[in-house]
Structure formats: C-alpha cells, structure tokens
Amino acid sequence: VLSAVLLATTGWSWYLGQVAEATVDRTDAIPGSGNEDSGGAAEAMNLLLVGSDSRADLTEEQLAELYAGTDSGLNTDTMILVHVPADGSAASFVSFPRDSYVQIPGHGEDKLNAAYAYGYAAVDSSLPETERQAGGAQLLVQTIHDLTGLQIDHYAEVDLLGFFELTSVVGGVEVNLCAAVDDREYSGAYFPAGPQTIAGADALKFVRQRHHYDNGLGDFNRIIRQQVFIAGVLRNMLSTDVLLDPGKQRELVEAAARSLTVDQDLDLFSLAAQMQSVTLDGITFQTVPMADPYAEDEQGRSIVRLEDEDTLHQFFAQLSAEPEAPEAPAAPPAPVDPSTVSVEVLNGSGISGLAASAQGELEAAGFTVTGTGNAD
C-alpha cells in the first residue's frame, strides 16, 4: 500500500513499478476456496495488510537493538484490512486486535493471531519454507474472509526487519507524546514527553509497545499508535520533499518493495493507478466492532470478543459500499418559441430610431412586436 501510494504520485511511475516488481517477494497467499466473491464492485479492492513477528532475517545484533527476543515468530500481531473503492477516491483501514476470539477454519475458536501459525504448521515440515508461509497466509485470509464477509483480493506482509528498513528510509514520523514512556522491560520503548521524530528501531518499539500507561488497554493503544504511524508515513510519502525528488522516490519504492511479501497476483502498477486519486483527507482508520474487549476464554486468557457475525458483515458491507454517483443535473428547460412572445419596444435612450432598429432585429428573430415608441 505504501509503495503503491508513491507509485501513484510520480511522473515516472512505470519505471518505479518495474523496480518494485523486480524486488518484491511473492507468496501464494490467496486460497482457491474459502474466499468467495462477496458481490461487491469488481474494480474495488480488499487488501489484507499483515505485520508478522518473524525474526528469520535478523542478526543477533538486530534482535538486541529491536528488543525482538528469540521467539519463533509465527504470529501476526498486526492485521489491517484496506478497502479501496472502484474509483480509487479513498482508502479505509480497519484494524483487528490480535486477541480477537474468532472461528479459525478447521481449528475452532482461538485468538486471531494464531491463524497464521495453524496454517503454517499444517503444511508438511519437509516442504520448502515458502510453502509453509503460504499455508499460514491462506488460513489467515480465510479467517478474515469469514469474519468480514468480504472477498480478500490481495495480501501484503511486512516482518520486523522490513518495517525497520522502511521506516529508516522514510525518515521517521513526527509524534507528540503526552507523557514520557519507559517500556524497556518489554518492547524497549523509551521516549521523553513532547514532540519528536521516531524512525528505525525506535519506530518498531513505538508500534509494538503495549505495557506502559495502558490502563488495561495495551493492545488497543498499540492499534492507535500503529494507525497514527501509518498515517504519518503516508503523509511523508505524499509530501513535496518526496514528490519533487526522484532519487528519494526510487529509494522509498525500493525499501517498500524489499520490505513486503505480496500475493502472486498483486500488480503494484495497477494498484498505483487505482489509488492515484487518494489524498490524506480520503484515508480513514477504524477498528473492527467489539462486543467485549476485556473478556477471558475458558483457559483464563485475555481475549477480545467481537460483535456477532451479522453485525460484522453489515459493518463491512457498509464500509465496502461504493460511493453513490452524484445526481445528474436537471435537464435544461425547453426553449421558448419566439413566435409565442409578444414584445413592445420603448426607446428610453433619447437617441432617435433605436426602437425601430430593435423592432427589426426582434422580428427577424421570430418575436412578435406589438408596437414601438418612446419611454416616458
């Protein structure tokens, strides 16, 4: 999505599109079944944007710098559905809490961020890693499809290293913290209060932090921070500093493409063309409707209970509804037949002969002149 925004705003987008296509990784993320057409406009697009906690490409030094630990990294801690209408006039981002308690096809109820891990584990371990990753992506796509009632057209995933590299190239995002943050025990976030620019490793800590000043709202505060940060990245990409700098454009496209793994059929150039009318005012951020954000499952784990299926499907149907076409302008009134109009010409100018001259022109145009004279 970020690379597409940049491609859509440049005069040499075809070239940048080729650069992105040559760099981006592909995965077979869209399942052949369990993701049926939801009947929306054919040209509209639903893209599942995923942030995984994969640490596969991180060195020990990077693990330490990013406070990433050494977990296996099969969870998807950030899941955002991006809807772009057929006319490309807007983009809606809907976040899903990672602890959303949902039906995962073939596995019953569990936290949403476990869907990828289930799909990954279901693929024979003797097969290539790329096939196991595709299995994880496909089950997550099926789960989101069932939740929303929408067909998921495309998939884009960024891991910890990719996010770190992208935010480093973007140059960071300006934030204004109401209070100092000290979450060094968990995410590593350690920021003073007040305005500051956050990039690279600090950016990753900022969007992953959920233990400090959360008042029990850790994951929801994290979602807000993620949405704020994405909006800031988009603002930077649409700034004149980028739009007027071809070198910066290429650098950002290369970083975005290196950071992403996308489905086999996502055409970045077509996506850019579809989003070329999107402005910051046309971008909205929401969170999926929740019934109980502080629930527990039978094992005593903290979970988020979402609204029922009908409510969720109605919410996403409204979200994906195409904007109504503006009403056609009223037809102009029928022209008046000049022969039906009677005119009396009175000369008030004081110049002799003007009334007679006007009479001749009006009669030539088809009007009926009932008389001429001088005005009082």
Regions found by a protein language model. Name each.
Residues V1-D376:
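Non-catalytic, solvent-exposed segments at the cell envelope interface
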